[in-house]
């Protein structure tokens, strides 16, 4: 819902790799398609890790545009690790790390200043915060201010963003 509410704003920031103004829409359609297809699993009892694995597969099948594909690849890598239902802080870190690696390796020409940068920053800040927190939800929540800082630096990493006066969508 949050993403859908802000998709037009994201679309307005979309200048890289193609300035076609559809980044927000592509991510929304990717998630909506995956959620709609998860109705096929309604009558099945699934543990959270198994649900995430199926959801990530549906995201990839329904992915739209570069942003939808990269988001789907991250979720696939993440779900691959937590499908065992181990949501300890260490395993969530491994899942984030695997999600980032999967998204990075699955991107034809990975560039700093994009959503890949935010995924890497999440991985790095999560690792740092693991030293002081045990709850993965709290750790992820505490990464948000740092991720906003990194996002605000994306124009310095990718000249096309600086030229347009925007952060990465």
Annotated model-derived regions:
Residues 1-169:
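N-terminal loops that bind phosphate or other acidic moieties
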């Amino acid at each position: 819902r949050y993403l859908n509410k802000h998709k037009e704003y994201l679309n307005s920031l979309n200048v890289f790799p193609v300035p076609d103004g559809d980044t927000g829409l592509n991510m929304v359609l990717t998630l909506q398609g995956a959620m709609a297809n998860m109705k096929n699993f309604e009558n099945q009892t699934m543990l959270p890790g198994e649900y995430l694995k199926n959801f990530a597969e549906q995201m990839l099948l329904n992915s739209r545009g570069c942003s939808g594909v990269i988001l789907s690849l991250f979720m696939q890598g993440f779900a691959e690790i937590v499908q065992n239902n181990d949501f300890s802080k260490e395993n969530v870190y491994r899942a984030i790390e695997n999600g980032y690696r999967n998204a990075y390796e699955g991107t034809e020409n990975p560039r700093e200043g994009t959503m890949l940068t935010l995924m890497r920053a999440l991985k790095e800040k999560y690792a740092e915060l693991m030293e002081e927190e045990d709850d993965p939800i709290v750790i992820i929540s505490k990464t948000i201010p740092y991720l906003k800082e990194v996002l605000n630096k994306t124009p310095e990493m990718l000249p096309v963003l600086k030229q347009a006066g925007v952060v990465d969508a």
